[in-house]
């Protein structure tokens, strides 16, 4: 019980942005939070904080009588009125959902985006979002489909795992750091507002420089990602505790001469020491070019889309 109360206090003690949706209170009415109702069942309620869109599931009894009554009313109301249902795609963003790779720009970055036309209409909690970070020298803005990211949009795969996919363009090819990493995060936040994206199913992956970027963004925004797949990359082993609870599957070629395999090995070892349930696949005899081997593997896609926050 003490652990539960600590979680509730941590959730509610944070300062919040201007009022929107409704104000929630703890049972003793000492702490408040502005958030939206998402769902409830079996004596628990899930709410989404306005400030950063984080979701929390709390025991109903930990909230005020007024909040408990509100939740019961929500449960009795028609499902179509549930604010937890994803809304429809907004304006100009809806036009980007054509069933083909379209071009967009925002927050200092150009990017490609893919989504089927049917994703213009919200359904349930929304659809997954996959973020793919290219390697050094990569150009996702050519007429071709973005290499690496296109594996998620192939017809046979997409029919079973319908989702949004974005691939940002790194403007200077000098790593997914600084304003470039910030730009990726801001694009994701904007898409959460403008498209029916499920905030609990946002997946991050990248190859080579993008593999480094994957670890960087895990460290920068650990609560944003439902799963991550760094391929032939590396990162800072000292930062892994921040995201040790995120499901991660690391891939590397044992004979990589561009990014030594020790880069991934060090990250995996640090994650294991932090008690992460990290998965690691090392391809014997393989060099740096393992991306196709990774992204063409059906087991990888099955694993990614099984994950949720």
Range-by-range predicted roles:
Residues 4-13:
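Sec-dependent N-terminal signal peptides
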Residues 16-101, 105-108, 161:
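Compositionally biased alpha-helical segments
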Residues 76-129, 207, 217, 265-268, ...:
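A domain-start/cap signature at the N-terminus of enzymes
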Residues 118-125, 173-209:
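Gly/Ser-rich "nucleophile elbow"/oxyanion-hole loop immediately N-terminal to the catalytic nucleophile
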Residues 129, 133-187:
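Active-site machinery of serine-nucleophile hydrolases
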Residues 161-163, 243-248:
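Short, proline-enriched alpha-helix->beta-strand connector loops that line the catalytic pocket
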Residues 194, 200-244:
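Primarily recognizes the serine-hydrolase "nucleophile elbow" in alpha/beta-hydrolase
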Residues 231, 247-251, 257, 261-309:
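C-terminal catalytic histidine-bearing segment of alpha/beta-hydrolase fold enzymes
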